[in-house]
Swiss-Prot record:
Family: Belongs to the peptidase S9B family.
Entry's transmembrane regions: 100-120
Enzyme Commission number(s) from the entry: 3.4.14.5
GO biological process, one term: proteolysis
Identification of the protein by name: Probable dipeptidyl-aminopeptidase B
Gene that encodes the chain: DAPB
GO molecular function: aminopeptidase activity; dipeptidyl-peptidase activity; serine-type peptidase activity
Length: 938
C-alpha cells in the first residue's frame, strides 16, 4: 500500500521576548478596560476561543494570514488550555481589581528588568543557531529565535534534500564504471560518462583512455521524423551503444506502468525510425533491448512482439492477448503488489530466449472507478452523454475472490515457438503466485508461493532441455507462523573456476535467526546454502545490493548498528570477513547503488544530519575515487536559520518488546508546559516510520510551527524488530497495532509536559485504517481525536495478494476479517471527534471503504465526525489542488480540535443576538480573563 534562503531575523532571546509579551499584555488590557469602563458589561463564564488570542507579537509569521492568533514565541500557537476562565463568578471588574492588576504588573516589570540584567550579565542568552542541524545536539539545547518553517515550504519541496540518480551501464566489452546521463545541464542530451577517466588520482588516469571518457549518443533533446518534431521522455542505449531506444508521448497508466511511442535512434547517422515501422504512432506498453543488441522485445495491446535490428521485420509472438490476457506486462495487482514495476519480460543473457509471464484475468471481477471531472482515457464522450462520468473498469481481485492465473512462458528466438515447462508437484492455477523469474545461464530460477504466501517453492527450469524440477520448498508457517516476503533482489552468480566458483549459483534472502539474511546456493539446485549473514538482532534490507564477481564480494545494506539505521557492508562468498563500507562509528542512514561490476558506487547519506552524495570506488577497486556530487548547502543553510523540531529518539517497552519512537518537540520546548500530542503512524506489516533519515515534513511543521508534540511510534507488526514480533499480527490486522499505539499514548499522557486531554492520532492508507482501529479500541479513554485519510475499513475490500498474505482468505479466517473491519461505531462515538477524507477515484483503496463506514455511522446514529471527499483523486489525492487542500484541512482541523472547537458540536443551540458593541466588549473581557489566567499559571 503506498506517494518530491534566508538569514536569521535577529529576534531577541527567547527569555526577553516572553517577558516583554507578558508585561505588555497586562498594560494593553488595562488601557482597554479604561476605554470601556463606562459600559461595565457582565463577564459570562464560557470557553475561550483561540482565535481571540492577541497576535501582536510575531507579526512576521507567514502563516498568520491563514490562522488568527498565533500566540507568542514561547508559548507557540494554540497551546493554552481549554478550560473556561472567570473572575469572581461574573461580578463587575471594579477599581479594586484594577489596582491589584497594576500592582501585579509593576511587580512583573521589576522582576523582568532584574532578570534581564542578570541574564545579559551572565551572557547566557542564545542567538539563532549557526551550526548544522544535528538531532543529537538538539536534545540538549533548543534552537532559538529562528524563522518558522511554513507549510508552503514543506509542500513546495524547500525542505527536500537534493539528490541525483545515476544509471550505471556496462560497456560493450563489460567495462565497469560507465554512467549514462540524459538531459544534464551543459552537456549533450545523451552522454556516456566513464568515471575512471575522471579519477582525481593522476596516476590512475594514465591507465585509462581519456578520449573515451565521454561519448555522445544523442546531441539534441529532440528529433524530427517525417517533418514532425518529437521530444524524448526516456532513453535506453543498446549494449553495444550503437543505437538508443527512445520514448515519446509517454502517458501514465498505473503506479509504474505507462504507454508511449518508441523509436530506434541510430548513433552514427543521428536519425530515428519508429519501433513499429508500419505504425509510427502505435502506443507500446513495454520495450527492452536484447543483451546482444540485435533485437527488441515489446508488448503492444497486451501481445508480445519481436523487432529485429537491421531490418524492419516485426514478429508477433503471441496473438490472443487482450482485455483479459496479458503477455510480458503485469496486470493491476501484479504491478502493485508483486513486481513493483511495469515489465514481466526477461531476456536470456545470450539473447536466444525470452521468458515472460502470461496473466489470465478472465475470472477476476472488475471494479468500476468513476471520474466525474476529468476523462483520463482522453476519449470524447458520445453525443448526449457529456454529463455522465467516465468509468474505468479495473480487474481487481479482492480477498477471497478469483485471482489472475499466471504462468511462465518462453520464446525460442531461433525456432520461433512459445513453450511452457510443466513441473510436478506445483501449486494449482488458482493457488499460485509467481514472485521471481531470474535467468541463471541457460536455466531459469522461478520462485512461487501459494496465494496466502506461507509456502514458497523454488523451481529450476532448463530451457534447452525444456525440463524443470523443484529444488526447495519452504513452509514459512511452520517456521514462525508468518508469511513469505516478496523480493526482486535475487542475484545469479555464474561459475568461474579461476575465481573459485566451480558451479553456478544464486544469492537469495532467507529466514534465519529471526530475521531476513543472505544465503548463497551453489549449485542452484542445492537446498543447503552457505549463510553469508546470520544475525541475530539485525537483518539485511532489500539485499543483496550488488555482487563483485572479480573479487567474490557481496554488498548489502543492513540494520546491524541499530534498527533505525542503515549501513552498507560487504562479505565474501564463503560467508567470511564481513566489513562495513560506511562509517559505523556515527549514526547513519545510507542508500547505495553500484556500477555494473561493483567497482564504483553512488553512496547516499540520508541522515540524521544534512544528506549528501558521493561517487566512490569500492574497497576492492585499486583505483581510488571519491567525488562529492551533492552536499545540500542550501538545505544546511535553511536548517541553521529556521527553527526545526527537537528530535528525541528512543524505545518504549510494550509487552516485553522494545519498540522505536521518534518524538518531535517544539523548538522552545519546556517541561513546565502542557503540550497537546499528535501521533502519526503507518503501522503496516513490515513497514518502518521511525528512522534516522533527515526529514522536514508535515509532522515537522506541526511540531516546529504549531507548537505541538508529534510522536511517531512503530508498534509490533512493523519491520526490523525481529520476525517473531512482526508476524504477531497475522490473521488479526489492526488489533495488536492498536494496543501498542494506545500503550504509547498512555505513556505520553503520563508525562508532566503533556496535556492528556488533547491527544490525537492520524495516518494515511494503512495508517488511516490503523487510526480508526485505534480510536475504536480506545473508545475515547486516551485519544480524543483522529484523522484518517484513504483508509481501508474492511479487508474484504482490498486486493487479494496483499491482504491474504497477512489475513489468509475470508473463507479461512472469517472471524478475523470481521474483527479487523472498522465496525464498533459506538466506540468511535466515544471519541470527541474524528476526520475522514478519501479520493473518490482511488483505484487502490476504493472509496467504498469510506462509504461503508459512513453507512455504519449513520445506522449507529454517530455524528461526531467530519468528512471531505476529493473528486477524481486517486490514492495520492492530488487532482485539482487536492493535495494542498488536504494538508490545509489536516492542519486546521487539528488546531480546532486542540482548541476545543469540536466540543460545541452536539445539541447545537442558536446564540442570542446582541448589539455589535456588546460583542466587542465581551471579546475584550475574554482576552483579559485568558491573560490573567496565564499570569496566575506562571
Amino acid at each position: 500500500m503506498p506517494v518530491d534562503k534566508k538569514s536569521g531575523n535577529g529576534r531577541p532571546s527567547l527569555d526577553s521576548v516572553s517577558s516583554i509579551s507578558t508585561t505588555s499584555i497586562v498594560f494593553d488590557h488595562l488601557n482597554d478596560l479604561e476605554i470601556h469602563k463606562k459600559h461595565r458589561p457582565h463577564l459570562m463564564t464560557e470557553s475561550i476561543r483561540r482565535d481571540d488570542h492577541l497576535s501582536d507579537f510575531d507579526d512576521d509569521d507567514p502563516l498568520k494570514q491563514e490562522m488568527d492568533g498565533e500566540g507568542d514565541l514561547e508559548t507557540g500557537p494554540f497551546l493554552a488550555g481549554r478550560d473556561a476562565y472567570t473572575f469572581g463568578g461574573g461580578k463587575y471588574m471594579d477599581r479594586k481589581f484594577r489596582r491589584i492588576m497594576i500592582v501585579v504588573a509593576g511587580l512583573l516589570v521589576a522582576a523582568w528588568v532584574g532578570g534581564l540584567f542578570v541574564y545579559i550579565a551572565s551572557k547566557s542568552y542564545k542567538h539563532a543557531t549557526t551550526v548544522e542541524h544535528d538531532p543529537e545536539k538538539t536534545k540538549a539545547a533548543a534552537l532559538t529565535s529562528g524563522k518558522k518553517i511554513t507549510m508552503d515550504q514543506v509542500r513546495s519541496g524547500t525542505w527536500y534534500a537534493a539528490s541525483h540518480d545515476i544509471t550505471w551501464i556496462a560497456g560493450p566489452k563489460g567495462e565497469d564504471g560507465l554512467m549514462i546521463e540524459v538531459g544534464a545541464d551543459g552537456k549533450d542530451y545523451i552522454v556516456i560518462e566513464d568515471g575512471r577517466a575522471e579519477n582525481p588520482d593522476s596516476s590512475a588516469e594514465a591507465e585509462v583512455d581519456v578520449t573515451a571518457s565521454r561519448r555522445t549518443l544523442m546531441k539534441n533533446g529532440s528529433f524530427r521524423y517525417q517533418g514532425r518534431m518529437h521530444i524524448p521522455s526516456g532513453a535506453e542505449p543498446s549494449r553495444d551503444q550503437q543505437k538508443v531506444l527512445l520514448r515519446t508521448e509517454q502517458k501514465s497508466n498505473w503506479r509504474h506502468s505507462h504507454t508511449a511511442c518508441y523509436w530506434i535512434w541510430d548513433v552514427a547517422t543521428e536519425t530515428a525510425e519508429p519501433l513499429i515501422p508500419a505504425s509510427p504512432d502505435a502506443r507500446v506498453q513495454n520495450a527492452q533491448w536484447s543483451p546482444t543488441s540485435d533485437a527488441i522485445v515489446f508488448t503492444r495491446e497486451n501481445n508480445l512482439y519481436l523487432r529485429t535490428i537491421g531490418s524492419k521485420k516485426v514478429t508477433q509472438i503471441t496473438k490472443d492477448g487482450g482485455a483479459d490476457l496479458f503477455y510480458g506486462v503485469p496486470d493491476w495487482v501484479y504491478e502493485e503488489e508483486v513486481i513493483a514495476g511495469a515489465s514481466t519480460t526477461w531476456w536470456s543473457e545470450d539473447g536466444k530466449y525470452v521468458a515472460f509471464l502470461r496473466t489470465n484475468e478472465t475470472g477476476v471481477p472488475a471494479f468500476p472507478v468513476q471520474y466525474f471531472m476529468s476523462r483520463p482515457s482522453g476519449a470524447s464522450p458520445k453525443a448526449g452523454e457529456e454529463t455522465y462520468p467516465e468509468v474505468r473498469d479495473i480487474k481487481y481481485p479482492r480477498s477471497g475472490s478469483h485471482n489472475p492465473v499466471v504462468d511462465v512462458q518462453f520464446y525460442d528466438i531461433a525456432r520461433g515457438d512459445v513453450f511452457t515447462v510443466d513441473i510436478n508437484g506445483g501449486f494449482a492455477d488458482e493457488d499460485r503466485l509467481i514472485t521471481t523469474v531470474l535467468w541463471a545461464g541457460s536455466q531459469v530460477i522461478v520462485k512461487e508461493t501459494n496465494r496466502v504466501s506461507d509456502i514458497m517453492r523454488v523451481v529450476l527450469i532448463d530451457v534447452k532441455k525444456r525440463t524443470g524440477k523443484t529444488t526447495r520448498t519452504v513452509d514459512v508457517g511452520k517456521i514462525d507462523g508468518g508469511w513469505f516476503e516478496i523480493s526482486q533482489n535475487t542475484k545469479y552468480i555464474p561459475a568461474d573456476p579461476k575465481k573459485g566458483r566451480d558451479q553456478d549459483g544464486y544469492i537469495d534472502t532467507v529466514i534465519h535467526n529471526d530475521g531476513d539474511h543472505l544465503a548463497y546456493f551453489s549449485p542452484p539446485d542445492n537446498p543447503d546454502p552457505i549463510m553469508l549473514t546470520s544475525g541475530p538482532g539485525w537483518e539485511v534490507v532489500d539485499a543483496p545490493s550488488a555482487v563483485d564477481l572479480e573479487n567474490n564480494l557481496v554488498y548489502f545494506i543492513a540494520t546491524k548498528e541499530g534498527s533505525t539505521q542503515r549501513h552498507v557492508y560487504s562479505v565474501q562468498l564463503d560467508g567470511k570477513n564481513m566489513k562495513s563500507f560506511t562509517d559505523t562509528e556515527a549514526k547513519g542512514y545510507y542508500d547505495v547503488s553500484f556500477s555494473s561490476g561493483a567497482g564504483y558506487a553512488l553512496l547516499s547519506y540520508k541522515g540524521p544530519k544534512i544528506p549528501w552524495q558521493k561517487v566512490v570506488s569500492t574497497p576492492a577497486n585499486n583505483q581510488r575515487y571519491e567525488v562529492l556530487i551533492e552536499e545540500n548547502k542550501e538545505l544546511a543553510e535553511s536548517a541553521r536559520k529556521y527553527d526545526l523540531p527537537l528530535l528525541n529518539y528512543g524505545t518504549l517497552n510494550v509487552e516485553g518488546v522494545e519498540l522505536n519512537y521518534l518524538e518531535r518537540r517544539p523548538p522552545q520546548f519546556s517541561e513546565k508546559k502542557k503540550y497537546p500530542v499528535l501521533f502519526h503512524q503507518y503501522s503496516g506489516p513490515g513497514s518502518q516510520s521511525v528512522s534516522q533519515k533527515f526529514s522536514v515534513d508535515f509532522q515537522s511543521y506541526v511540531a516546529a510551527s504549531l507548537g505541538y508534540i508529534v510522536v511517531t511510534f512503530d508498534g509490533r507488526g512493523t519491520g526490523f524488530i525481529g520476525r517473531k514480533n512482526r508476524v504477531l499480527v497475522r490473521s488479526r490486522l489492526g488489533e495488536i497495532e492498536a494496543q501498542d499505539q494506545i500503550a504509547a499514548a498512555k505513556h505520553w499522557a503520563s508525562l508532566g509536559y503533556v496535556d492528556p486531554s488533547r491527544i490525537a492520532i492520524w495516518g494515511w492508507s494503512y495508517g488511516g485504517f490503523q487510526t480508526l482501529k485505534t480510536l475504536e479500541a480506545d473508545a475515547g479513554r486516551t485519544f480524543s481525536y483522529g484523522m484518517a485519510v484513504a483508509p481501508v475499513t474492511d479487508w474484504r475490500f482490498y486486493d487479494s495478494i496483499y491482504t491474504e498474505r497477512y489475513m489468509l482468505t475470508p473463507q479461512q479466517n472469517e472471524d478475523g476479517y470481521t474483527k479487523s473491519a472498522v465496525h464498533n461505531v459506538s466506540a468511535l462515538a466515544s471519541n470527541k471527534r474524528f476526520l475522514l477524507m478519501h479520493g473518490a477515484s482511488d483505484d487502490n483503496v476504493h472509496f467504498q471503504n469510506s462509504l461503508t463506514l459512513l453507512d455504519k455511522l449513520d445506522m449507529g446514529a454517530v455524528e461526531n465526525y467530519d468528512v471531505h471527499v476529493f473528486p477524481d483523486s486517486d490514492h495520492s489525492i492530488f487532482f485539482h489542488n487536492a493535495n494542498k487542500i488536504i494538508y490545509d484541512k489536516l492542519e486546521n482541523w487539528l488546531v480546532n480540535a486542540f482548541n476545543g472547537e469540536w466540543l460545541k458540536v452536539n445539541n447545537a443551540k442558536p446564540v442570542e443576538l446582541v448589539h455589535p458593541t456588546q460583542l466587542v466588549r465581551e471579546r475584550e473581557k475574554a482576552k483579559l480573563r485568558k491573560r490573567w489566567q496565564e499570569i496566575q499559571n506562571k
